Amino acid sequence: MSTEAEPRVLREVVLSQLATGESRAYKMWLPPLTDPTPVNELVERDYQRRPLRFGLGIMDEPRRHRQEVWGVDVSAAGGNIAVGGAPQTGKSTFLQTLVVSAAATHTPRQVQFYCVDLGGGGLMYLEDLPHVGGVATRAEPDRVNRVVAEVKAVLRAREQVFKQYRVGSIASYREMRDDPSNPASQDPFGDVFLVIDGWPAFVAEFPDLEPAVQDIAGQGLAYGVHVIITTPRWTELKSRVRDYLGTKIEFRLGDVNETQIDRITREIPANRPGRAVSLEKHHLMMGVPRLDGVHSADNIVEAISSAVQQIAGRHTDQAPQVRVLPERIYLHQLDPNPPGPDSDYRTRWQVPLGVRESDLTVAYNQMHLTPHLLIFGAPKSGKTRIAHAVAQAICKRNSPQQVRFMLADYRSGLLDAVPQSHLLDAGAINRNSATLEEAIKALAVNLKKRLPPPDLTTAQLRARSWWSGPDVVLLVDDWHMVTAAAGMVSPMAPLGPLLPAAADIGLHVIVTCQMSMAHRATMDKFVGAAYGAGSPTLFLSGEKNDFPSRDIIVKKRPPGQAFLVGPDGKEVIQAAYVDPPEEEVFSPPSEGS
C-alpha cells in the first residue's frame, strides 16, 4: 500500500498557507446596527471620553468604514438636547442610558439630574441613583412644580454668584468649584439637568411651567444648567423652546416629513427601538442602561436596578434632593421668633403668609405698605384657618395699644382668633347685619378724624404724627354671607371712601370669601377697591370658571395651598395654619338630675 501523499494543486497549497496567517483582509462592510451596546462597553470603547461627554450609542460611518461610540459633549453649545420620535421608538430608554452613562463616568457632585416623567415611568427606576435629585410623575403635580422651581432656583442663584465673583464663563466656574479654597466650592450643584420625558403632556398639564422651562433653556447653558426634552412630534416643540436645544436626536418619526435633521430618517427600520439619526446625519444604535455587558434590552428593569446599585456603591455623596411644599405648615413653624411690640412699625407689620413653592422661603405681606389681605377659596380649602393664622401673627407682633380688631363673624368661625385684649372696646364682634352696620358706622366716624390734613410735610406723613391710637384690623369671614344678608346697601359702605387712605389712617382689612363669589366680590365697591389697589390676594382651591383670568391660576388644590397675587408678583404658597379651637363636649344630664 502506497504511503505517498496525494499531489495538491498550487491553489490548495496557497489557500492553506493563507488561512494560517495572522493578517486578515480588510472588512469594508461592517455588521448592521441591530443589537444595543451596554453602557459599560460604551464607556470602555469611547476614545473621546472626557468630562461632561456622555457615551450614548454606536454610530455607523459607512464612508469611513467605521463604527464607533457616539456621544454628546454637554459642556459646549450642544448642552441642551431635544429627542424626537414616534411612540415606542426608544426615547425613554435613551434618557435612561444618558443618565446611567453620566452617572457611570461622573460623581454626584459633578452632575445632577431632576426629572419629570410623563412617559411610561421609566425614569422612576433611576430615582435611587445618587446623581438623581428627584423624579416627578403626572400623579404628583406639586412635585412637578417643585422640580422645575428647584432647577430655576439653581439658575437664579448661579446668576448672582457669577455677578458677585465676576465669573466670566461656566468653564471658569467649574474650575472654581474644584478648588477647595474658593467660595464657589460650597455650591452643592454642579452641572444640573432638567429632564422632561413627554413634552406634549407637560405643556397640556402644566402650561404655567412652559415659560419657566423656556427661560432655563435660553439662559441655563451659560451657567451650567441644561434641559433635555423628548417629544413624539417636532411640531409639539414650539420654536421658542426648540431653538434653544442645540443637540437634536431623531428616532423613527410617525411622519418623516417632519424631520428636523434629514430625510435619511426614512431609512430607519421600523420596529427597531433604539435606532436613530444624529445631527451629523449618521445612523445610530443607542445603548442600553445596563452595566452587565449584555447586548440586549431584555430584562431591562432588573439590569437598571443592578446598575443603580453598582453605581450607588461607588459614592458616598448625594445630589441635593427636591424639596416639596409641606401639606401643612403651622404658624409657629413659619414664625418661631416673631418680633415683639418694641420693634418698629415696619417690622411689626411684616406678617408671614406661608411658604413659597419657588424657593421654600417665607412669603410675607408687607402690611405697612399693602394694608389689606383677600382670601378666596372653595369650602374646606382653608380660608378661615389662614385668617386665624394671620390674626394671631399680628397680635404676637403688636400690643393692645398698637392694634385692635373688629370681627364680622356670621358663622362663628373666628372664635379664639383674636384674644379679648386685642378687640375693640365696642362693636368688636358682629354676628349679624344689624350690629355690623352700626359698628362700621362708628368705626368710620373715628377713622375720618385720622385723615391727613392737606398741609402735612412728607416727614409727618411718614411718621403719621397727626393722630394717635391703635391700628384697626377689620376681619371679615365669609364675605358672601355678609353681602347676602345686607340687602341692597352693603354695611361696609361707610368705609369705602377711606380705603385709599388706609395706610395713612391705620386701617387694615382682611376678607375671606367663597371662590364661587370671588369674581363678584372683586366687582364690589369695598372688596373691589382693595383688590384694585393691588392688595395681596390668596386664591385657594376652586374651579377655573369661578374666576376666569389669563393671569391667575385657579384650580383644585390641597387645603392651604394658594396662588398668591401681590405687588411682588405671582407665586404658589402653602399658607400658614393654626389648629381650630377644641370643641367643648357637653355630656347629657344624668337621669336623676
From Swiss-Prot:
Cellular compartments annotated: Cytoplasm
The keyword Transmembrane helix appears for this protein: no
Keywords tagged on the record: ATP-binding, Cytoplasm, Nucleotide-binding, Repeat, Transport
SMART domains hit by this protein: AAA (SM00382)
GO molecular function list: ATP binding; ATP hydrolysis activity; DNA binding
Binding site for ATP: 85-92, 377-384
Consequences of knocking out this gene: Loss of DNA conjugation when disrupted in recipient strain, strain does not secrete EsxB.
Span of domain FtsK: 66-260, 350-546
Entries under Pfam families matching the protein: FtsK_SpoIIIE
InterPro entries membership: AAA+_ATPase, EccCb-like_Actinobacteria, FtsK/SpoIIIE/SftA, FtsK_dom, P-loop_NTPase
Domain of life of the organism encoding this protein: Bacteria
GO CC terms, sorted: cytoplasm
Cited function: Part of the ESX-1 / type VII specialized secretion system (T7SS), which exports several proteins including EsxA and EsxB. Plays a role in DNA conjugation, in both donor and recipient strains.
Subunit structure: Part of the ESX-1 / type VII secretion system (T7SS), which is composed of cytosolic and membrane components. The ESX-1 membrane complex is composed of EccB1, EccCa1, EccCb1, EccD1 and EccE1.
Protein name: ESX-1 secretion system protein EccCb1
